[in-house]
Structures are given as C-alpha cells and as structure tokens.
Amino acid sequence: DDAVLDGWASQYGLENLSAEKFRPYLDGVADQLQIHINEAHEINACAHKVIQGCEKMQFSWKPAQRNVKQCALTGHCLAGCPSDRKMSSLVTHLPWAAAHGARIFSDTEVVRVLTRDGRARGVEARITDPDSGAHVADMQVDADMVVLAAGAIHTPLIMQRSQIEDRSGQLGRNLSIQPFTQVLGKFKEPLYGFRGALVGVQVDEFTRTDGFTIFSGLAEPESLLAQGDMKAGKAHIDFMKNYKYYAGVNAFSTDQGRGYVEWSGDAYSGDKTIHWNPNREEFNNMKASAALAARIFFSGGAEKVYMPTFQNLEVDSVFALDETLDKVDFGLKGMYTFRANSFSPHGTCRMGADPYQAVVAPTGQVY
C-alpha cells in the first residue's frame, strides 16, 4: 500500500522507503515470486460464499493476490505446497542464493553476534540433531558484515543475547502481531470449501476506515485441528461429518504495538519471553471484525456461524448475533476469549532516522 510506505517515510524519516523510491523494488520482487491477482479458477466455493455475502451487504471485495506459479489447486497451502508451486523461500531465494555461491547450514541456530571494536565481526552458532534436538557441534563464522534476518521474534533475541547496545531502549519493544480470528459458516449445500486455492478473495470495505481486512479461507481439517478448533469426542465426530458444508474466513484487525520480546539469562541456557495481550480497544476490534465476518456469512446464506471463541459459541441467525457477542467479554487480559492467530509479527527492531526512537538506521545499520 503506497499510503503505508509514504507514512513510514514521513513519520520515521525513511525517505528511501517512500512509495516513489521503494515501490519499484517491491514490484520487482513481486514479479520474481509470480505474485498475481487470483483468476476465476482460483476462487473456490468457500470464496464464492464470501462474494455472495458481500454483494448482498454492498461491501467492497476483490480477488486476493498470491505468490504461486500455475496453482494446482490441491488445497494443502498451510501444510506446504506438494507440487512446489507456491513461491516460498524454499523454492526461490534459498536456491537462488545457493546458485550464486551462498552456503546454507541447516539445523544451525545463531546464538549470538560476535563484535569487536564496536563492529559486528561474525556469529556464533550451535548445530543440533534434527531428530533428537541434541547439541552436536558449535560453529563460528567470521565476516566483515553481518545481516540479521530472523524475523520480529528471533532478531531481537539474538541481539539481546549478543548484548548489543540498545541506545533507544526500543529493542524487542513495539511488537505488533495484526491478530486474526477464523470464523466458520455452515451452509445447506456441500461446499468442500477446503478444496482449491486456500485464499480466494479479500473484503477491503473496512481496511482504511477501521483496519479490518477479511480473507476467505477454510483450512483443510488436519490444519484446523492443530489450532484446537474442532471440538472433542462426539462433538468432534459431528463437526467432521459436516465439514464439507463449511466455509471459513480469517478476520484481521490492527493492534497498537504494545508487545515485547525479551531474552533473560545466559546466551545458551537462558530463556525468552514473548508478551502480547490486547487492551480493550484491540479486543473490541477483534470482536468487531469477527462480527462483520459473521454478517457476511449470514448474508451469503449460512444456516449457522461458529464464532472463534473458547466458549464454542454458535449463532443460528443474524438476529441473534449481537446477543451472542454480548457474551464475549474481555475476561483475564483479553487473552482467553478469542482463538487468535498471527501471520505477521513486526516492530521489534524498528527502523528510523532518530537514534533515540529506533533500533536501526535508514541504512539498515544498528545504531
């Protein structure tokens, strides 16, 4: 989104990340990763129910974009594409880097960055057995430049274990996760909504106004089971018998970046803390986005909607939705009500022109 890029440029002094300067690089990567707008055959029955609901509600929607090359429509996206058509790093950047001389070490975890005279001079790592998890060897790599790209969780942890100076006090802070919940709708006719492309369409009616974005997508049964959303005993059996009648969406909302990641203790024997819980405003945003998803399903003809709560709340009519949602309360720190997930934690090593507000300079160098 160009508005996001321009916001980074103006708010944090990151002129090189403005849409004018940075967009060409993003477009180049998009071409490399085969990112394209879903075509008609990539929009499955689950997505069509979302479309029907949006059309009736007069909500804006559009086909989603995916990084996939000639999708085989197998539906195993969450478990790894069986035909390697999803353009993940496993089939793109890693083999491309290897072809240009990069050496890749599997089962090897960077413990800390080695520094000398105020500069990063290499890394210290340990190698583990992939089956037993046992520590089998140590490794040291000397380098003129060290690039940390371990995501919003492990990048600050490595820096903290390395005792890198934190001038701004922001290292590991400002964790945002953009939480989402999965809402399921049950329909009269069989949909087999887990077949075909996982993500078909997105609802962008509320993206700019409220920060809500809703994507169609019903996980295959075993993937949903991993989230603990499929009940137990007889209830599980009944749920599975009806799985072909379900459609699903992921309802995203925004958060304020109040979480943190922290390492305590020795670099090898210490432990990490990942802390995030919603405040009441963020909690209400999660509830509102889930409610919109439910209304879309009812407008699309759903007989029942399953709300993403630990209470296993089921709604039989749009007229009962508000009453049901009144039962969803903040509870203990807002953490034990919704079954929330995150795909995109970020913010823990933020970049900026002010060394007292940011961890990383606009050049990518740590202050």
Question: Could you describe each region identified by the protein language model?
Answer:
Residues 1-70, 277:
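Rossmann-like flavin
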Residues 3, 21-24, 45, 49, ...:
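Generic recognition of stable, solvent-exposed alpha-helical segments in well-folded globular domains
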Residues 7, 25, 53, 57, ...:
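Generic, well-ordered alpha-helical scaffold segments in large soluble proteins
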Residues 42-67, 287-289, 295-324:
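Patatin-like phospholipase A catalytic core
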Residues 53, 67, 72-144, 175:
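Helical element adjacent to the flavin cofactor pocket in flavoenzyme catalytic cores
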Residues 63-64, 73-77, 111-124, 302-367:
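A glycine-rich dinucleotide-binding beta-alpha-beta segment and adjacent secondary-structure elements
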Residues 99, 108, 113, 124-201:
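Glycine-rich loop(s) and the adjacent beta-strand/alpha-helix scaffold that form part
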Residues 168-297, 304, 328, 333-360, ...:
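FAD cofactor-binding and catalytic pocket of flavoenzymes
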